[in-house]
Regions:
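A short acidic, Gly/Pro-enriched loop at the edge of an enzyme's catalytic core
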Residues: 125-136
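Conserved Class I S-adenosyl-L-methionine
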Residues: 214-272
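Class I SAM-dependent methyltransferase SAM/SAH-binding core
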Residues: 66-70, 74-126
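N-terminal auxiliary segments of SAM/dcSAM-dependent transferases
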Residues: 1-23
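Conserved alpha-helix/loop element of class I SAM-dependent methyltransferases that forms part
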Residues: 27-37, 42-63
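A short glycine-rich, Lys/Arg-flanked "PGG" loop and its adjoining helix->strand segment in the class I
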Residues: 150-165
Protein backbone atom coordinates (compact mmCIF):
# COMPACT_ATOMS: atom_id res chain seq x y z
CA UNK A 1 0.00 0.00 0.00
CA UNK A 2 1.34 3.39 -1.01
CA UNK A 3 -0.44 6.17 0.87
CA UNK A 4 -0.86 9.89 0.36
CA UNK A 5 2.21 10.66 2.49
CA UNK A 6 5.78 10.29 1.27
CA UNK A 7 9.10 9.30 2.82
CA UNK A 8 10.12 12.94 2.48
CA UNK A 9 7.15 13.93 4.67
CA UNK A 10 8.23 11.47 7.35
CA UNK A 11 11.86 12.58 7.17
CA UNK A 12 10.88 16.24 7.54
CA UNK A 13 8.56 15.44 10.46
CA UNK A 14 11.25 13.75 12.54
CA UNK A 15 13.99 16.18 11.53
CA UNK A 16 11.87 19.07 12.83
CA UNK A 17 10.24 17.44 15.88
CA UNK A 18 13.18 15.60 17.45
CA UNK A 19 13.91 18.25 20.09
CA UNK A 20 10.26 18.42 21.19
CA UNK A 21 9.97 14.66 21.66
CA UNK A 22 13.28 14.47 23.54
CA UNK A 23 12.01 17.10 25.97
CA UNK A 24 9.20 14.97 27.36
CA UNK A 25 9.23 11.46 25.83
CA UNK A 26 12.80 10.40 26.59
CA UNK A 27 15.73 12.81 26.86
CA UNK A 28 18.02 10.09 25.49
CA UNK A 29 16.10 10.21 22.22
CA UNK A 30 14.26 6.89 22.34
CA UNK A 31 10.82 7.09 20.75
CA UNK A 32 8.68 3.98 21.13
CA UNK A 33 5.89 2.66 23.33
CA UNK A 34 6.01 0.52 26.45
CA UNK A 35 5.04 -2.89 27.81
CA UNK A 36 3.50 -2.56 31.26
CA UNK A 37 3.68 -5.33 33.86
CA UNK A 38 4.24 -5.80 37.59
CA UNK A 39 7.87 -4.68 37.27
CA UNK A 40 7.02 -1.35 35.61
CA UNK A 41 3.87 -0.17 37.32
CA UNK A 42 2.72 2.95 35.49
CA UNK A 43 6.26 4.24 34.84
CA UNK A 44 6.41 4.93 31.10
CA UNK A 45 10.20 4.76 30.66
CA UNK A 46 10.38 1.54 32.66
CA UNK A 47 7.69 0.12 30.37
CA UNK A 48 9.72 1.15 27.30
CA UNK A 49 12.78 -0.60 28.75
CA UNK A 50 10.67 -3.67 29.51
CA UNK A 51 9.58 -3.87 25.87
CA UNK A 52 13.24 -3.90 24.84
CA UNK A 53 13.95 -6.75 27.25
CA UNK A 54 10.89 -8.69 26.11
CA UNK A 55 11.89 -8.45 22.45
CA UNK A 56 15.45 -9.60 23.22
CA UNK A 57 14.07 -12.57 25.16
CA UNK A 58 11.65 -13.57 22.41
CA UNK A 59 14.19 -13.13 19.59
CA UNK A 60 16.96 -15.03 21.38
CA UNK A 61 19.55 -12.32 20.84
CA UNK A 62 23.06 -13.17 22.05
CA UNK A 63 26.59 -11.87 21.54
CA UNK A 64 26.88 -13.61 18.17
CA UNK A 65 23.92 -11.70 16.71
CA UNK A 66 24.23 -9.33 13.76
CA UNK A 67 21.25 -6.99 14.04
CA UNK A 68 19.72 -4.48 11.66
CA UNK A 69 17.77 -1.87 13.64
CA UNK A 70 15.15 -0.68 11.17
CA UNK A 71 14.20 2.89 12.04
CA UNK A 72 16.88 3.34 14.68
CA UNK A 73 16.13 7.01 15.34
CA UNK A 74 18.73 8.53 17.65
CA UNK A 75 20.44 5.16 18.13
CA UNK A 76 19.40 4.75 21.76
CA UNK A 77 18.09 1.20 21.46
CA UNK A 78 20.89 0.09 19.14
CA UNK A 79 23.46 1.21 21.70
CA UNK A 80 21.49 -0.51 24.46
CA UNK A 81 21.48 -3.73 22.41
CA UNK A 82 25.21 -3.50 21.82
CA UNK A 83 25.92 -2.88 25.49
CA UNK A 84 23.46 -5.40 26.90
CA UNK A 85 23.93 -8.27 24.45
CA UNK A 86 27.47 -7.79 23.15
CA UNK A 87 26.18 -8.04 19.57
CA UNK A 88 26.82 -6.11 16.37
CA UNK A 89 24.17 -3.59 15.31
CA UNK A 90 23.66 -1.46 12.23
CA UNK A 91 20.94 1.18 12.53
CA UNK A 92 19.20 2.86 9.60
CA UNK A 93 16.73 5.74 9.60
CA UNK A 94 15.19 8.17 7.13
CA UNK A 95 15.94 11.18 9.32
CA UNK A 96 19.33 12.68 8.67
CA UNK A 97 19.02 14.68 11.89
CA UNK A 98 18.50 11.58 13.98
CA UNK A 99 21.24 9.59 12.24
CA UNK A 100 23.59 12.48 12.94
CA UNK A 101 22.53 12.39 16.58
CA UNK A 102 23.17 8.65 16.72
CA UNK A 103 26.61 8.95 15.14
CA UNK A 104 27.53 11.73 17.57
CA UNK A 105 26.26 9.79 20.60
CA UNK A 106 28.25 6.74 19.53
CA UNK A 107 31.47 8.77 19.86
CA UNK A 108 30.80 8.97 23.61
CA UNK A 109 30.61 5.18 23.92
CA UNK A 110 33.56 2.88 24.70
CA UNK A 111 35.89 2.27 21.76
CA UNK A 112 35.09 -1.45 21.72
CA UNK A 113 31.37 -0.74 21.33
CA UNK A 114 32.08 1.71 18.53
CA UNK A 115 33.64 -1.14 16.53
CA UNK A 116 30.39 -3.12 16.73
CA UNK A 117 27.87 -0.39 15.91
CA UNK A 118 27.17 1.80 12.93
CA UNK A 119 24.46 4.15 11.70
CA UNK A 120 23.49 5.27 8.22
CA UNK A 121 20.68 7.13 6.50
CA UNK A 122 18.63 4.74 4.39
CA UNK A 123 15.10 3.70 3.49
CA UNK A 124 13.55 0.47 4.74
CA UNK A 125 12.30 -0.13 1.20
CA UNK A 126 15.80 -0.12 -0.33
CA UNK A 127 18.30 -1.46 2.19
CA UNK A 128 21.98 -0.97 1.24
CA UNK A 129 23.06 -4.44 2.40
CA UNK A 130 23.74 -7.76 0.63
CA UNK A 131 21.37 -10.71 0.92
CA UNK A 132 21.68 -12.66 4.17
CA UNK A 133 23.68 -9.98 6.01
CA UNK A 134 21.93 -10.24 9.40
CA UNK A 135 20.82 -12.80 11.95
CA UNK A 136 18.09 -10.45 13.21
CA UNK A 137 16.04 -7.53 11.94
CA UNK A 138 14.65 -5.46 14.81
CA UNK A 139 12.18 -2.60 14.55
CA UNK A 140 10.15 -0.51 16.99
CA UNK A 141 7.46 2.05 16.14
CA UNK A 142 8.72 2.40 12.58
CA UNK A 143 7.09 0.30 9.86
CA UNK A 144 3.75 2.10 10.14
CA UNK A 145 5.62 5.12 8.72
CA UNK A 146 6.83 3.15 5.69
CA UNK A 147 4.51 3.95 2.82
CA UNK A 148 5.37 0.83 0.82
CA UNK A 149 5.09 -1.72 3.60
CA UNK A 150 5.26 -4.78 1.35
CA UNK A 151 8.60 -3.56 0.00
CA UNK A 152 9.91 -3.08 3.55
CA UNK A 153 8.87 -6.61 4.55
CA UNK A 154 10.49 -8.05 1.41
CA UNK A 155 13.71 -6.16 2.12
CA UNK A 156 13.76 -7.36 5.74
CA UNK A 157 13.36 -10.92 4.46
CA UNK A 158 16.11 -10.45 1.87
CA UNK A 159 18.79 -9.19 4.26
CA UNK A 160 18.15 -11.92 6.84
CA UNK A 161 20.16 -15.12 6.70
CA UNK A 162 18.22 -18.37 6.38
CA UNK A 163 16.65 -19.06 9.75
CA UNK A 164 17.07 -15.41 10.74
CA UNK A 165 14.59 -13.62 12.99
CA UNK A 166 12.43 -10.56 12.37
CA UNK A 167 11.12 -9.07 15.62
CA UNK A 168 9.12 -5.86 15.44
CA UNK A 169 6.10 -3.96 16.64
CA UNK A 170 3.76 -1.91 14.50
CA UNK A 171 0.51 -0.01 14.58
CA UNK A 172 -2.53 -1.72 13.11
CA UNK A 173 -5.99 -0.68 11.96
CA UNK A 174 -8.49 -3.06 13.58
CA UNK A 175 -11.31 -1.87 11.33
CA UNK A 176 -11.47 0.12 8.08
CA UNK A 177 -14.17 2.59 9.15
CA UNK A 178 -12.64 5.23 11.38
CA UNK A 179 -13.97 8.50 12.74
CA UNK A 180 -12.93 11.96 11.63
CA UNK A 181 -11.21 12.42 15.00
CA UNK A 182 -9.12 9.28 14.52
CA UNK A 183 -8.24 10.33 10.98
CA UNK A 184 -7.13 13.77 12.17
CA UNK A 185 -5.37 13.02 15.45
CA UNK A 186 -3.99 9.56 14.72
CA UNK A 187 -3.48 8.81 11.05
CA UNK A 188 -2.96 12.24 9.49
CA UNK A 189 -1.01 13.58 12.47
CA UNK A 190 1.43 10.66 12.28
CA UNK A 191 1.53 10.72 8.46
CA UNK A 192 0.48 7.13 8.00
CA UNK A 193 -2.18 4.67 7.01
CA UNK A 194 -2.13 0.89 6.96
CA UNK A 195 -4.13 -1.84 5.27
CA UNK A 196 -3.36 -4.27 8.09
CA UNK A 197 -5.30 -5.36 11.12
CA UNK A 198 -3.52 -7.45 13.75
CA UNK A 199 -4.69 -10.59 11.92
CA UNK A 200 -4.14 -9.56 8.29
CA UNK A 201 -0.62 -8.38 9.12
CA UNK A 202 0.24 -12.01 9.82
CA UNK A 203 -1.04 -12.95 6.37
CA UNK A 204 1.21 -10.33 4.77
CA UNK A 205 4.22 -11.67 6.68
CA UNK A 206 3.47 -15.24 5.59
CA UNK A 207 3.03 -14.09 1.99
CA UNK A 208 6.49 -12.49 2.17
CA UNK A 209 7.98 -15.84 3.18
CA UNK A 210 8.12 -15.57 6.96
CA UNK A 211 6.94 -18.15 9.45
CA UNK A 212 5.05 -16.58 12.36
CA UNK A 213 6.56 -17.82 15.62
CA UNK A 214 4.46 -15.54 17.82
CA UNK A 215 2.06 -12.62 17.46
CA UNK A 216 0.91 -10.60 20.47
CA UNK A 217 -1.80 -7.94 20.46
CA UNK A 218 -0.39 -5.09 22.56
CA UNK A 219 -3.22 -2.61 22.07
CA UNK A 220 -3.89 -2.28 25.82
CA UNK A 221 -0.23 -1.35 26.30
CA UNK A 222 -0.48 1.25 23.52
CA UNK A 223 -3.44 2.77 25.36
CA UNK A 224 -1.49 2.78 28.64
CA UNK A 225 1.49 4.40 26.89
CA UNK A 226 -0.60 7.26 25.54
CA UNK A 227 -2.37 7.74 28.87
CA UNK A 228 1.07 8.29 30.41
CA UNK A 229 2.26 10.52 27.58
CA UNK A 230 -0.87 12.68 27.68
CA UNK A 231 -0.19 13.42 31.35
CA UNK A 232 3.52 14.06 30.81
CA UNK A 233 2.93 16.40 27.87
CA UNK A 234 0.06 18.14 29.65
CA UNK A 235 2.23 18.86 32.67
CA UNK A 236 4.67 20.78 30.45
CA UNK A 237 2.19 23.64 30.08
CA UNK A 238 2.65 26.25 27.35
CA UNK A 239 6.29 25.58 26.51
CA UNK A 240 7.23 25.23 22.82
CA UNK A 241 4.44 27.63 21.75
CA UNK A 242 1.65 25.42 23.04
CA UNK A 243 2.96 22.28 21.35
CA UNK A 244 2.66 20.23 24.54
CA UNK A 245 -1.01 21.08 24.96
CA UNK A 246 -1.67 20.04 21.36
CA UNK A 247 0.16 16.76 21.88
CA UNK A 248 -1.62 16.04 25.15
CA UNK A 249 -4.98 16.48 23.44
CA UNK A 250 -3.89 14.33 20.48
CA UNK A 251 -2.71 11.59 22.84
CA UNK A 252 -6.10 11.62 24.59
CA UNK A 253 -7.65 11.13 21.17
CA UNK A 254 -5.34 8.18 20.53
CA UNK A 255 -6.49 6.58 23.78
CA UNK A 256 -10.08 6.97 22.57
CA UNK A 257 -9.15 5.51 19.18
CA UNK A 258 -7.77 2.38 20.84
CA UNK A 259 -10.93 2.10 22.96
CA UNK A 260 -13.11 2.38 19.84
CA UNK A 261 -11.14 -0.21 17.88
CA UNK A 262 -9.79 2.38 15.44
CA UNK A 263 -6.13 1.84 16.36
CA UNK A 264 -4.16 -1.18 17.51
CA UNK A 265 -0.61 -2.32 18.19
CA UNK A 266 0.97 -5.69 17.55
CA UNK A 267 4.26 -7.43 18.28
CA UNK A 268 5.45 -10.01 15.74
CA UNK A 269 8.18 -12.63 15.98
CA UNK A 270 8.95 -14.21 12.60
CA UNK A 271 11.54 -16.51 11.05
CA UNK A 272 12.90 -16.66 7.52
Amino acid sequence: MQGKFTEQDTEAFYDSEDAVYRSFWDDQGSLHWGFFDDTTGTDFLKACARLNELMVEKAGIGNDARILDLGCGNGTTAMWLGNSCGCRVVGIDLSGTRIGNAQQALLDQPAELQTRLGFEKASATELPFPDGSFTHVWSQATIYHVHEKKSALREAHRVLENGGILVFDDLTKPRPDISDAARTYVYDRLLFDTPYSFETYQGALKHTGFSILEAVDLSTHLKASYECLAKIAGAKGDEHDGKYGELSYAYDQMVRAVDKGELGWGLYLCQK
